[in-house]
Every structure is written in structure tokens, then in C-alpha cells.
Amino acid sequence: MNPSAGGILSPDHAAALPPGPAQDALLKAVTTEISDKGFVLASVDAVVNWARTGSLWPMTFGLACCAVEMMHAGCSRYDMDRFGVVFRPSPRQSDLMIVAGTLTNKMAPALRRVYDQMAEPRWVISMGSCANGGGYYHYSYSVVRGCDRIVPVDIYVPGCPPSAEALMYGILQLQKKIRRTGSILR
């Protein structure tokens, strides 16, 4: 694999490669470029997005039974730390909010307040049927019919409750979305 004019970290190579020959070839190309030139050519967007995808810090907003599956995903069996996902207790330290469960009308202002306390860039994952659209309680007078009416949602994870694997898949989809976005204004 020869480095292109755009550098090793061009948008074509920005996606994470699974272990194997393709990853070995990429690592060899990076090592060769560093030893030849002493530096690696990359766009600032690719480096910033690579750092953001590898260090998502979610703040949990567990409202109902979906929160149990969210805790399950954070435990040792699924080990979200290997994807750079480390749960944080404060919204000021977080860049991802996972809304898991039924959002009531009384809880909606608190959700918005916590979202506003998060630093930019920030993302939201809506987890479960209740957070996505009201779910089982859709016709109740006290339920918000989807948290996207209160905060902008990036990824929807369906299910009642969704499995830990579904949440992991949603986080991986969010990482893909972050890789595709441009973060530096031109």
C-alpha cells in the first residue's frame, strides 16, 4: 500500500480497519512514511474525528428498564472501554448523552437542561421504544412521544428494551457518523 498524495489518513482510510492484512499494510505504510519523512501527512479533520471517535464519553440518562441494558453494555462482557467509551457522571465532562427509557413531561426540562450543559460537539443516542416514540406509554397524557421533541437525536436504537448488542451497534454507528463529519470550518 503506497501512501497517496492525500496522505495515509485520507478519508478513504479514516474508517477503522479490522485486524488482518489490510490493517497490517496500513500500519506498515504509516511506519514507512514516518521513517522516510519524519512525519505523516493527514488532514486536520481526519485527525480530530479520529480522536473524537476513540474517546466518546457518554453521560447516562437512564429513565426506565432500558437503563439496565445500558449498564449491562458497560460491564465486562461487552467492555465498551475498548471502543473508547467511558461513562462520565457529569454533563460537563460528557460529549454523548444516552437517553434510555420513558421520558415524562416533568423530566423533559431536566433533560434539556442537562443537554445544554454538555460541551460542543455533543451527540445524543435515543435508546428504546419509549425514548424513540413513547413506546408502550405513547398515548399517556404524561409521556413525551420521543425525546427528539426535546433534544436533537443522532442515533435511534430500537427495541423494548434493546439488547446490549444493539446499543453497541448504535455507538459504532455514531462513530461512523462522526468520522464522516467535517469539524474544521474552511
From Swiss-Prot:
[4Fe-4S] cluster binds at C65, C66, C130, C160. InterPro entries: NADH_UbQ_OxRdtase-like_20kDa, NADH_UQ_OxRdtase_20Kd_su. Binds 1 [4Fe-4S] cluster. One of its GO terms (molecular function) is iron ion binding. Transmembrane segments: none annotated. The keyword Protease does not apply. Keywords: 4Fe-4S, Cell inner membrane, Cell membrane, Iron, Iron-sulfur, Membrane, Metal-binding, NAD, Quinone, Translocase, Transport, Ubiquinone. NDH-1 shuttles electrons from NADH, via FMN and iron-sulfur (Fe-S) centers, to quinones in the respiratory chain. Couples the redox reaction to proton translocation (for every two electrons transferred, four hydrogen ions are translocated across the cytoplasmic membrane), and thus conserves the redox energy in a proton gradient. It catalyses: a quinone + NADH + 5 H(+)(in) = a quinol + NAD(+) + 4 H(+)(out). The keyword Cell membrane applies. This is NADH-quinone oxidoreductase subunit B. Its cofactor is [4Fe-4S] cluster.
